[in-house]
Amino acid sequence: MSAYLHCLSHTPLVGYVDPVAEVLAEVDEVVAAARARIAAFDPQLVFLFAPDHYNGFFYDVMPSFCIGMAATAIGDFHSLAGPLDVPRETAEACAAAVLEAGVDAAVSYRMQVDHGFAQPLELLLGGLAEKPVVPVFINGVAVPLPGFQRARLLGEAIGRFARSTGKRVLFLGSGGLSHQPPVPELAKVDARMADRLLGSGRDLPTDERQARQQRVISAAEGFVADQNSLHPLNPEWDNHFLDLLEQRRFAELDGLGNAELSALAGKSTHEVKTWVTAFAALSAFGPYQAHERYYRPIPEWIAGFGSLSAHSLS
């Protein structure tokens, strides 16, 4: 019984708005090294914690957390499309264990996911269906949002379940760090966009999806030229966050409110709760050692870009 973890920022802007070649090569090297370490660990079961960007989860029913019994990636921004290899019975047992632990997570037998799930599977495992994976959605953009404490408790519950399987388990966290790309807010949009956020956005026409993606690309180009055009990145907070994870002090984030986090680091920074959930899950295996920390603010990707591995010491 052993566990490994890797948390990684994701970005849909790769190949659309990229940093200079040296930075791109640096990130590629970090990802390749992480992929090699995961391959050497050879996980038998993967738990992937990731957010959504109004591609699979909408305000018709917006859970704080959702565990997938089956899942399909839509292939936005040239990410991979197709089904994930979800072990249904394991996912069902996990969902039951989480509820019994007092954490109210929804379930989905038809989960639709975007690049937030697909990108780490492609970059770190080589594809959507290379390993059995239980996908766990954590709401990171649609208010009202879950807080750090609930994310931590979810992770602890999933970690205890994962430990009970007796398998080599990989925990993946996807998202963050500090960033605030142009994401629509229900309280601030017109009726047509509100209808999209209420569920009609599940199956966007091709031209509308392309226009939506172009808005993000244009925002990134504008952010490179003027880093006050969006909420600025916050390397100081990002590195403090990484320190807390490395030092197993992530419970200290319980007292950080959602409004305060948005003000500090941007409204999409709530995606880092996937990292907290992953580290909390790993902690269920006992003490851990974090390693291979990487961080760089990358305005071209509108992100404080981070990568961090850890393994259980049991």
UniProtKB/Swiss-Prot annotation:
Gene Ontology terms for molecular function: 3-carboxyethylcatechol 2,3-dioxygenase activity; ferrous iron binding
Transmembrane spans: none
Record field: catalytic activity: 3-(2,3-dihydroxyphenyl)propanoate + O2 = (2Z,4E)-2-hydroxy-6-oxonona-2,4-dienedioate + H(+); (2E)-3-(2,3-dihydroxyphenyl)prop-2-enoate + O2 = (2Z,4E,7E)-2-hydroxy-6-oxonona-2,4,7-trienedioate + H(+)
Cofactor(s) the protein needs: Fe(2+)
EC number annotated for this UniProt entry: 1.13.11.16
Keywords, in A-Z order: Aromatic hydrocarbons catabolism, Dioxygenase, Iron, Oxidoreductase
Biological or metabolic pathway of the protein: Aromatic compound metabolism; 3-phenylpropanoate degradation
Pfam families: LigB
Statement: the UniProt record of this protein carries the keyword Iron: yes
EC main group: oxidoreductase
Assembly information from the UniProt record: Homotetramer.
Task of the protein: Catalyzes the non-heme iron(II)-dependent oxidative cleavage of 2,3-dihydroxyphenylpropionic acid and 2,3-dihydroxicinnamic acid into 2-hydroxy-6-ketononadienedioate and 2-hydroxy-6-ketononatrienedioate, respectively.
Family: Belongs to the LigB/MhpB extradiol dioxygenase family.
HAMAP family, A to Z: MhpB
Protein name: 2,3-dihydroxyphenylpropionate/2,3-dihydroxicinnamic acid 1,2-dioxygenase 1
Organism: Pseudomonas putida
Gene from which the chain derives: mhpB1
